[in-house]
Amino acid sequence: MTNISGAVVLVTGANGGLGVEFVAQALERGATKVYAAARTPRSWDDERIVPLRLDVTDAASVAEAAKHAGDTTVVINNAGVGGPEPISSAEFDDIRSVMETNFFGALAVARDFAPVLARNGGGALVNVLSVASWIAGMGAYSASKAALWSATNSLRLELAPQKTQVVGLHLGYTDTPMTAGLTVPKEDPAVIVRNAYEGIEAGQLEILADGPSQQVKARLSASVEANYPQLGNPLNDLQ
């Protein structure tokens, strides 16, 4: 388990809906400092918040951020973008762009900050995933989150010897700028972040932060046909 009280927290994608909540609630829970990392850092009105330039798609930027924020004990790997769909016809450059941010960018942050966390006692690395890690329907976004989920599982084992708590945070649609154009039920970002921090402090390694993530995880062992009824039974076409 990792306590947020007394921690030094780094949040990537700190300018977005979830990012702002991660910053605010870390301070509410007693974090002594929060690095608010973003490609174009914004100003904050709290001296405990340190704006930090970090472009997750730029290796030099990630390395410099890890050097500058060397006292970090909790990393919230939150930066992400939406993606094109369907994946069968989207431009490859667009798909690669999503993978660069959501997978390779998040992995770069994890790799460069792992030694920082080790030096500071282990701490926690939290990868913000999605129900899209487990289900299709969101094109390149689903593919990128599935890749990061797999990497999270590997990182959990690889960083265990240095006592780093590696957490996969899963959530469904959340009311953020990324989902502004979608007319679907959305969870309040404040609820997601509260559940995330509570899970971290409880020592959880996988956090299902809302109803949709809990429901999707529960049915993963079902057949492909059960999870995707729109497919029907392809064998019927052969009879």
Predicted regions and their residues:
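C-terminal helical subdomain
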Residues: 168, 176, 180-219
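Substrate-binding pocket helix/loop in short-chain dehydrogenase/reductase
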Residues: 86-87, 94-96
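Conserved NAD(P)H cofactor-binding loop of Rossmann-fold oxidoreductase domains
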Residues: 78-84
